[in-house]
């Protein structure tokens, strides 16, 4: 929190403060929770606790500014021209900043210059190029919860992409948070599931009324210019709309301008995509590896896109594979059709740049001159792209080409209006091209003519006075002046009026120079004011085309993704998978897309066959043998297929998949007080509750975090449930060799193993998948390979022989229903035992005792 410290004895009515500080305190009171950048001349100043906080966050000096109400005022400041760099640092630390500008004219103001907050910069609403990661989406999100489930909305303000969903349960909501990874998350003040969002960046607590459903509908209809939300398919999504309404209100509050690029909202439904929970996304290392970096991830291998907007779209595809095979087949067809034109298309696409985010800044009217120059450059690539795509014989490609548009008129406008290499800011001047506007050219000619005159004046005066150190200069405080060195200043003519004394020079003014100074400043000021006006008019000319421009940017991003996938398919030897309605996955010579790129030796490709008759594979073999790689590659091949990409295999045939689950590896979740085994069991429970017969399930080493018999029992029961009840497509890796007996007891279960060769104290991993169970685990050989001391390995071998002599069949213990007592219900007591328990032997005669013996014998 960044609040003014009331311990500073600041009066609530502000009357004891100077007028300037009164103005500051009133503005700060409107934004108590965030930092306030208060414009004063060429600096943004921060005061009180804001100053202390900013000095720590930005590593800038903390000073004092006089006194107000009798106390020194802590102060820190940053130059206005460097504000973007400081904002970037603050946003990266999750801070929000209110930008307060001078909107009045200091020359005409009585008292403090009028100021107001013109925008609020927050982590989820930034659109400035300097503040954004160019190849990552930057999302603002809002979450709502009621008794029926969750509402979740996300907005990418830098593209206008507005989405909502209604996760039914906590696991699905957690998966959505993991997938979208918002930069800023809004939640209601009474949100009950704080454990779900704790630790996330950019948390913002919002009042309940902002989530009110009627307000949400009103806000959204107002934004989209509609009477209802039926056309967007979200009319009945009340929980999602509550979140979306809060989000839109927050954006309007912070941006303080219209948002014409936010034109629609889309409902994301579970049935449209392949669902992956948070653990699955983490374990598959799609865009982030287990260490939190981006190296050796699926995206790192697959993403060779040439535009930032293409890179962001590819990552969205990877995190949300779709189930619509018509769209997927179109993507496959496009990839195949583009393979011969990759080398021609990519250099041209590279010149398009990040048109998507430029358009967002255009919509917010914050686009800078260089944004418009980049937009012009993107338009200049369109004719070449159209020419290259025109000859491609593919209906999807031609549909994309049509969406790209031409924009010849806008290209011509920007070529006439903006110079080739404009400055960073319009206030620097020199943005509008010569010839675009006659009056501007006239004012510039006056300014340039006056400047030429001043150059001639300097030469004339130097010759007239004979003073070789004489020169004409200018600064913002004293205007134009004639400067003479201290050594020659005594020779200055009598009509020179001293204006400023420096250490080594004197500065003078003459009437003629003052006259031309007025001309120069007037003409420059008029030119700059007109230039700003013309620049604003460019927005008015461009914005009516915003919808078509956004469609073009989306088409260009999609083209970049598909051209990239075509290049990756050719370069990495990927093939086109076939979709089928039959359940199962059949892979011939499948490879792990990431591991094969980092290996120094050739990757050993492996087959996989899952079908209704072979729904579960029990995978055995040594550690480091490749079990986890084999399992993950199956999931990654499936994932690539369901985004429309080619895949690393000789041939793939894939049936319907609704979810991908992974229970692979685990670590203690110390923050939540959960052990490795607890994490493992929680993830396992999620799979057993939510998997279906169309789910792809990867289970690696279930039950290893507890005692042998507990672990074996759990692994057996989980495998049995997945194979018999759920009937999911399952890869089940285990070190419990007892589980290799499952195929004999259940239909649809098969054994496969990864083999190794042991020679003396060395071991060679074959990494080749074979049918049948592994013959041994090679645990001691792997331990030796890891560098465990030889005496420990020797002792382990002795102990192994002892254990095997006690239980020769220990490696193949028969596990059946009678040995599952740990999880089974208590056995029923036999009739013989019940009879004996009810018998009183002291009351029996010898004859009765004999009769009981015969009766008990008959009961056994």
From Swiss-Prot:
Disulfide bonds: none annotated. Keywords: ATP-binding, DNA damage, DNA repair, DNA-binding, Nucleotide-binding. One of its GO terms (cellular component) is cytosol. PANTHER family: DNA MISMATCH REPAIR PROTEIN MSH1, MITOCHONDRIAL (PTHR11361:SF34), DNA MISMATCH REPAIR PROTEIN MUTS FAMILY MEMBER (PTHR11361). Belongs to the DNA mismatch repair MutS family. This protein is involved in the repair of mismatches in DNA. It is possible that it carries out the mismatch recognition step. This protein has a weak ATPase activity. HAMAP family: MutS (MF_00096). This is DNA mismatch repair protein MutS. It comes from Salmonella arizonae (strain ATCC BAA-731 / CDC346-86 / RSK2980). The gene is mutS.
